């Protein structure tokens, strides 16, 4: 086994408590998660926010890893300071350097168990493809959105997000915890297979590429004027057809989808995205080949 160190982060958002609870239970019962010999460094991303049950204190930690924020000595938001600390401790050049990061999240949307990859780095996609081949998890490929930047996993050589839902904020739910545990274990098992030189990569894998986001209709004061239509709520991953109901006004009027390409909505009515003016994101399904160069890039990173 190589000297690979994997940073396992939970509680990046302080009101997502299932991941932190799993890490706490794991510390008391090590056999809860089989690491398959991979070195794992568990850490709570935003412990102050977790203690208060809040998503964040000053700003979203998972948008605080932009280079301009990290390089500015004058920005003292607690999440930006925490982002710098995490990199100082666990970044590639940190005191306890980690090459790969797995960031655990939960969502109020009906996303099931999902892998989220930011950008199109070959090592991220190779790892996600390995995990998808083991568990069949969908991959949400989020790139090309200038309004959403500064994600934690982008600052490590390789990283992905495990997103599990639906679960209300601040609520422990056994099914969510078990899904998180299984996904973490699959990640570590996949990395162990790479480290031992025995990975079984698929010839191709499926991603859902980010197209953009839709907001709720809003009034002149910027307040929501309609809500997500009840027939759409909970239907993440189901293609939108022409004329499908999107939003419902208080008087019963329905706003319908007018596109023709049957995009696939994700993170429908996510509670945390209200402040970001996102009612849902739209994706398109892509079947991607898995080049040998990507596999080699992940192998090289793991062997370092």
From Swiss-Prot:
Cofactor, how bound (note): Binds 1 zinc ion per subunit.
Recorded GO MF terms: aspartoacylase activity; hydrolase activity, acting on ester bonds; zinc ion binding
Signal sequence, start to end: none
EC number: 3.5.1.15
InterPro entries registered for this protein in UniProt: AspA/AstE_fam, Aspartoacylase, AstE_AspA_cat, Aste_AspA_hybrid_dom
Catalytic activity as recorded in UniProt: an N-acyl-L-aspartate + H2O = a carboxylate + L-aspartate
Stated family: Belongs to the AspA/AstE family. Aspartoacylase subfamily.
Name of this protein: Probable aspartoacylase
Species lineage: Bacteria, Bacillati, Cyanobacteriota, Cyanophyceae, Synechococcales
């Amino acid at each position: 086994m190589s000297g690979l160190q994997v940073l396992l982060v939970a509680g990046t958002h302080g009101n997502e408590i299932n991941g932190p609870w799993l890490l706490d239970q794991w510390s008391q019962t090590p056999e809860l998660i089989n690491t398959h010999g991979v070195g794992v460094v568990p850490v709570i991303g935003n412990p102050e926010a977790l203690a208060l049950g809040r998503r964040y204190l000053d700003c979203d930690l998972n948008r605080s890893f932009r280079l301009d924020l990290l390089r500015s000595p004058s920005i003292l938001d607690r999440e930006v300071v925490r982002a710098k600390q995490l990199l100082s401790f666990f970044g590639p050049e940190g005191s306890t350097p980690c090459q790969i990061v797995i960031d655990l999240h939960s969502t109020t949307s009906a996303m099931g168990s999902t892998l989220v990859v930011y950008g199109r780095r070959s090592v991220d996609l190779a790892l996600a493809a390995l995990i998808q081949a083991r568990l069949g998890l969908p991959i949400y490929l989020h790139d090309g959105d200038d309004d959403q930047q500064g994600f934690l996993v982008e600052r490590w050589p390789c990283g992905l997000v495990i997103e599990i839902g639906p679960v209300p904020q601040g609520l422990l739910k056994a099914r969510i915890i078990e899904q998180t545990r299984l996904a973490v274990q699959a990640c570590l098992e996949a990395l162990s297979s790479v480290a031992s030189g025995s990975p079984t990569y698929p010839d191709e894998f499926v991603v859902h590429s980010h197209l953009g986001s839709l907001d709720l209709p809003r009034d002149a004061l910027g307040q929501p004027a309609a809500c997500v239509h009840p027939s759409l709520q909970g239907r993440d991953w189901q293609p939108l057809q022409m004329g499908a109901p999107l939003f419902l006004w208080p008087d019963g009027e329905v706003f319908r989808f007018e596109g023709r390409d049957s995009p696939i909505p994700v993170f429908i009515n996510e509670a945390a995205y209200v402040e970001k003016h996102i009612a849902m994101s739209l994706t398109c399904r892509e079947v991607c080949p898995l080049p040998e160069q990507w596999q080699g890039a992940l192998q090289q990173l793991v062997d370092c």
